């Protein structure tokens, strides 16, 4: 399978730079996995598509203000993008600079360069940075950090992004990108879903900056997936098994929820799914055997990205590419602040040949 098999033409004008005024007012393209049939509507139509007893699984990670600006004490501007908080004082980060800092280099961070930090070690593409400050990493980031908007949102971050680029149920700080399918859920919609009898559960996957890295190989089987930390606690496992037992569906809100659930299923030894607290490098592309997820709420993804590959493995390659072609023709809004899809699983997708 070639990366170019997942390419499609996308006019620049369809990339959303701001969200809709109301979270749940975006458009919704529904794709019936088995048949490929498409239905156009609005996000609140989800209420009619879910049944009492269905289980929605959300990712409750919270985006941290992970982008820092400053300079090396020796001179030279730098941009730091936190990949992971290691503890209260240390981070793994990507550092953009004309010349990469060496271990021991002193960094002056923040618009007023008031925060002192030291680059202590390098681990491949990542730099280990230690803050020389009384405050915790999270407090420092909340004080001087910028929201890490994706590279395709071509504007500086604004104060409003601190809430707009968060789900309303975000709880555990640690992500450097939002699980964007969840951005469309507001409290009124969540309340209506609960009133209908739809069950809800929460996994945690701290989305890393690697989610925006392009696939740099020609053959997708050669791609090495970035690592992210995920938690699937016992209460989620119980909710999944109970939903399956009563004949209801497990509906993942976002690809990060998919990756969390399917990672927990892959690692399970005795049951369909078991608790999971670990890093995951799961790479889902056509040919993957889904074990847990029956339906998916997701945004529109970048051409040639690992996420459009995940969707193709779920709905079928041809159905997915046809849906994206229709979305472009109908001028849906793309990417993080864009519109959404509701997709049901296509059990025949695993047998489909791509690029032959």
Curated annotation (Swiss-Prot):
Q: Does the keyword Metal-binding apply?
A: no
Q: Which domain of life is it from?
A: Bacteria
According to its UniProt record, the EC number is 2.4.99.17
Keywords linked to the UniProt accession: Cytoplasm, Queuosine biosynthesis, S-adenosyl-L-methionine, Transferase
Q: Where in the cell is it found?
A: Cytoplasm
What is any one GO biological process for this UniProt entry? tRNA wobble guanine modification
Taken from the record, one Pfam family name reads Queuosine_synth
Alphabetical GO CC annotations of the entry are: cytoplasm
Answer whether the UniProt record assigns the keyword Kinase to this protein: no
Q: Which residues form a coiled coil?
A: none
Catalytic activity annotation: 7-aminomethyl-7-carbaguanosine(34) in tRNA + S-adenosyl-L-methionine = epoxyqueuosine(34) in tRNA + adenine + L-methionine + 2 H(+)
Q: In which pathway does it act?
A: tRNA modification; tRNA-queuosine biosynthesis
What's a Gene Ontology MF term here?
S-adenosylmethionine:tRNA ribosyltransferase-isomerase activity
- Report the principal subcellular site: cytoplasm
Q: Which family does it belong to?
A: Belongs to the QueA family.
- Describe its partners and assembly state: Monomer.
Q: What's its job?
A: Transfers and isomerizes the ribose moiety from AdoMet to the 7-aminomethyl group of 7-deazaguanine (preQ1-tRNA) to give epoxyqueuosine (oQ-tRNA).
Which protein, by its recorded name, is this?
A: S-adenosylmethionine:tRNA ribosyltransferase-isomerase
Q: Which organism is it from?
A: Escherichia coli O81 (strain ED1a)
Q: What is the lineage of its organism?
A: Bacteria, Pseudomonadati, Pseudomonadota, Gammaproteobacteria, Enterobacterales
- Name the gene for this chain: queA
